[in-house]
Amino acid sequence: MKIALIAHDKKKADMIEFVTAYQPILEQHELYATGTTGLRIQEATGLKVHRFQSGPYGGDQEIGAMIARNEMDMVIFFRDPLTAQPHEPDVSALIRLCDVYSVPLATNMGTAEILIKGLERGDFAWRNIVRGRKGEINGL
């Protein structure tokens, strides 16, 4: 599975804590992240992470492009809902794409834990079928 990991600045420590706690599960998958988040994950865990640009410099859009090509299976995005983000339209577009392409999305630690536990059980094997039908999702 291809998993995107994104965290706003005030949530990066939470992301590191999450990835560290679930490293045995995450290391079995292909990880992607926006720039700084990916760097922090690599430094803290040693996991291999494909890094895009930082979110405000287009990283969210790069992940969104993978979603639109049906090449991303899950997004874990620890958002900071209390701080205005200069790239909020990109964030909204990313969330919209997850809905359009039925990509599981967690925007907080509680939901992320549910997704990861489901991933561990094999609950997302259906994504392999969906990924094989590029362009056919939701009648597109």
Swiss-Prot record:
One of its GO terms (biological process) is methylglyoxal biosynthetic process. The keyword Translocase does not apply. It catalyses: dihydroxyacetone phosphate = methylglyoxal + phosphate. Residues 1-140 form the MGS-like domain. It holds the Pfam family MGS. It comes from the Bacteria. The active site is at D60. One of its GO terms (molecular function) is methylglyoxal synthase activity. Keywords: Lyase. The keyword Lyase applies. It is an enzyme of class 4 (lyase). Substrate binds at H8, K12, T34, G35, T36, T37, S54, G55, H87. NCBIfam families: MGSA (TIGR00160), PRK05234.1 (NF003559). This is Methylglyoxal synthase. It comes from Geobacillus sp. (strain WCH70).
